[in-house]
């Protein structure tokens, strides 16, 4: 999807055929068949997810991102811890909750954006074990702990990916059991552990009332 197509999509410019195919994927498949640009409202400079590699709609997700030059600018070439948390949140509570809400309401993200604003509610503990530089591909592995009333809570981990590894191939047979145990190769380097990352889709009317 080009940026021009994305803007048309977010503006509600999907054709009926495209919308039908999108909804078919929402109801019958999972996030792996979608690009993050189709699910996340963030523009290209603030979107911190490149690819969805594995997804179980009610259990969790594995997604990846590779920090770009703009992500480490003026920060010694290091991808900041706060951006790691943001990347994890986009991959988990935002992507997964958007998918489930679209399924529930039989709609697309562009229709959701007219009703709700995604909001970061709270963060539990975050423990950093390693660092990430420009070009270091990492995965966010997220476990869904709670989802109700458009609010989602996830725990998870961030791992640096071994150089040259094909993530689509590696995770094609991944399971919910392995997800819960973080059962992956020791070649992955643990970067961060995250707990109780919480977000909620809030009605736009509530924001307008507070103005």
Where are these regions (language model features)?
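Extended, positively charged loop/linker patches that create polyanion-binding surfaces
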Residues: 100-132
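Short linear functional motifs in flexible/disordered or boundary regions
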Residues: 64, 75, 100-104, 154
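Active-site helix/loop of acyl-thioester processing domains in fatty-acid/polyketide metabolism
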Residues: 80-113
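Short alpha-helical scaffold segments that flank and stabilize functional sites
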Residues: 66, 90, 94-98, 145, ...
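Generic secondary-structure microfeatures
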Residues: 67, 89-92, 124-130
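Hydrophobic beta-sheet segments that form the core/acyl-binding groove
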Residues: 52, 121-165
